[in-house]
Regions:
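Exposed extracellular interaction/assembly regions and N-terminal maturation sites
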Residues: 1-2, 10-98, 132, 162
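Short, aromatic/His-centered strand-loop micro-motif at the edge of beta-sheets
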Residues: 105-114
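Catalytic-domain carbohydrate-binding cleft regions of carbohydrate-active enzymes
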Residues: 7
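Register-specific beta-strand positions within repetitive beta-rich fiber domains
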Residues: 28, 33, 140-186
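Short acidic, glycine-rich loop/turn motifs
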Residues: 68, 102-104, 173
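Short, surface-exposed terminal/edge motifs of secreted or surface/virion proteins that either
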Residues: 24-34, 94-102, 121-140, 181-182, ...
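Extracellular disulfide-bonded cysteine-rich modules/repeats
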Residues: 17-19, 116-126
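Tight coil/turn sites that cap or link beta-strands
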Residues: 81-83, 115-119, 168
Length: 187
């Protein structure tokens, strides 16, 4: 279902090497390939493809980046029999949603909100021939660097590492009251 063309015994005499090389290229593409897919324009559906025995399919890559200026909500689809995981990047401009789903059915989908211009790790499960699911498995992690108020759900274990503070910074309580302030020393 991801485009690799299986060879039967005695098949493709004289072209076996070429077809095998194409299959190896497909496998390489599936494990780490990158596709920059323009979805520019108004509200529309863009169908990503799988091409058996060929490396030209737009859904036959591990990472797919959506690009272009969008002026309406976008839907990007994959064929029903695809079962893999993707790293998706929304690099579009324009405040519209981008939905990633199977070509038909009412199974689960993954949608980038109008302001979400980030990455998602998704699994295309092909778990139902009529209504298969696509699931976001990003574990809620986005850019930790841009999170100005990260929160822990438990104790912080530094695993024998240090926590470094800038000069005149430290630990405050929930009301902003300073509890520990650290100063940089000369040694």
């Amino acid at each position: 279902p991801l485009g690799v063309e299986l060879q039967a015994t005695g098949e493709n005499a004289g072209t076996w090497g070429t077809k095998t090389n194409t299959n190896l290229s497909l496998i390489s593409q599936l494990f780490g390939g990158f596709n920059s897919q323009s979805i520019a324009g108004g509200a529309q559906t863009t169908a990503l493809t799988i091409v058996d025995g060929n490396t030209t399919g737009t859904a036959q890559h591990r990472m797919i980046e959506f690009t272009g200026t969008i002026t309406g909500n976008q839907i990007v689809t994959i064929p029903l029999d695809v079962e893999t995981f993707y790293i998706l990047r929304n690099s579009t401009s324009g405040a519209y949603t981008v939905q990633f789903k199977y070509v038909s059915g009412s199974g689960g989908t993954v949608t980038f909100s109008a302001t979400d211009k980030g990455d998602k790790l998704v699994v295309a499960k092909a778990n139902d021939g009529t209504n298969p699911d696509i699931v976001d498995i990003s574990f809620g992690l986005s850019s930790i660097v841009s999170d100005t108020s990260p929160q822990l759900g438990g104790n912080l274990d530094t695993n024998s590492f240090m926590i470094d503070f800038d000069d005149a910074h430290g630990i405050r309580d929930e009301n902003g009251n300073e509890q520990l302030i650290f100063e940089t020393t000369g040694s």
